[in-house]
Structures are given as structure tokens and as C-alpha cells.
């Protein structure tokens, strides 16, 4: 397919975000995901535009859909950050002013002001926290338990482990965000949003950034 071919509408193509564990898709405004072993069963007929943070999963996609196009070079995000992941770049591209929290296998926090990425940090994801506690001491090998509030101090080890985990994440987000709007995406976004009253869950945030990138490249027509 020629690089300059353009599409009139999102429904004419499929966006793909290749992560470390799952491969996520957006077809028009419908979201779905797949393990790499199940890609062929999807039977995708439309043109695929993708980003990737995992080489093995990217190869799996290309084995099934060899005409899929990597859009990493289709846009420019203003930033001084060296080595910013393509998924973080796309999420930042979708926000003009605010704090972007991607709560996936790792939790990334990025600040954007007037369209420029100012910097960010990376925390372990919830599963990584649980694994770290398990490695630290037998008594800290506690199952994850969703908390309703951080207002009451825990009275047992299981709650204390989960409390410390969530408080460290929320405190970091609040420290960086101050009075800025917080946008959350990723698998644990909805859970974390309960502790951030002025936040907004945007499960399509990375795909919104991809849509903007394609429009800037002239591949998707602006509306």
C-alpha cells in the first residue's frame, strides 16, 4: 500500500497497540484484544496501522497480517525525554494539557503542557508490586485486595500491604499532577480512578493519539 493512500473514516481501518502481554485493537470505536496465538482467528480484512513495545508480539502480528503498517515514524511529539515509549508518546499526543497515567504492567506518569511533553516517571504495576512483596518476605506474600478507601489505616498485614502499594502510587500521581487534570488509561485505570476524584478514565487514549498521528500524516482525513 502506498504510504500516501488516505482513508476517509476510522471505520475504514484498524488501529493496533501491541503491548507486552496483549495485542489491543480499535475498529471504529469498538475495542478488543487478543493473545498473539489467536491473531489469525480474528480474520482481519481491513488495513492495520500499529504501534509496538514488544518485538515478539509485533512479529506475530506481521506473520498473520504482513501488510500491517508501523506508524512510529508518522508523527512528532515535542519532548526532551530520551527513549520515551511509543505507547506513552501516543497517549501524550492525545492530551494538550494534563497528566497521563497509563496503569498497565508498569504504571507510567507523564506531564504535558501546551502539547509539549515535560517528562515523566515509571512505577511498578500492581502485579509487580505484589511480586516484589512476595520476593521480600514470606509474611508479605499476600493476595491483592481492592481497597475502598485510604482514609482508614489497616489493622492486618494483608490490608497493610495493599494500602502501602496503592498509597505509594496515588501519592506519586497527586504530587506530579497538583491541580492539573489527570487522564487514566490501561487495565487498572478504573480502579485507580476511585482514589483520584478529579481524574478521567480514557480507555481509548492511546488510540486517540494514533488517530491524531494518522491525521497529521495525511493518512486519515480530518473531520
Curated annotation (Swiss-Prot):
Residues reported to bind ATP: 17-24, 105
Subcellular localization, as worded in the UniProt entry: Cytoplasm
GO MF annotation: an example: pantothenate kinase activity
Catalytic activity: (R)-pantothenate + ATP = (R)-4'-phosphopantothenate + ADP + H(+)
GO biological process: coenzyme A biosynthetic process
Active-site residue list: 87 (proton acceptor)
Signal peptide: none
SUPFAM superfamilies listed in its UniProt record: Actin-like ATPase domain
Chain residues that bind K(+): 102
Binding positions for substrate per the UniProt entry: 81, 85-88, 157
Pathway linked to the protein: Cofactor biosynthesis; coenzyme A biosynthesis; CoA from (R)-pantothenate: step 1/5
Keywords: ATP-binding, Coenzyme A biosynthesis, Cytoplasm, Kinase, Metal-binding, Nucleotide-binding, Potassium, Transferase
Note describing how the cofactor binds: A monovalent cation. Ammonium or potassium.
Cofactor annotation: NH4(+); K(+)
EC identifiers of the protein: 2.7.1.33
Listed InterPro entries: ATPase_NBD, Type_III_PanK
Family membership noted in the UniProt record: Belongs to the type III pantothenate kinase family.
PANTHER family in alphabetical order: TYPE III PANTOTHENATE KINASE
Function: Catalyzes the phosphorylation of pantothenate (Pan), the first step in CoA biosynthesis.
HAMAP family listed in its UniProt record: Pantothen_kinase_3
Quaternary organization: Homodimer.
Protein name (record): Type III pantothenate kinase
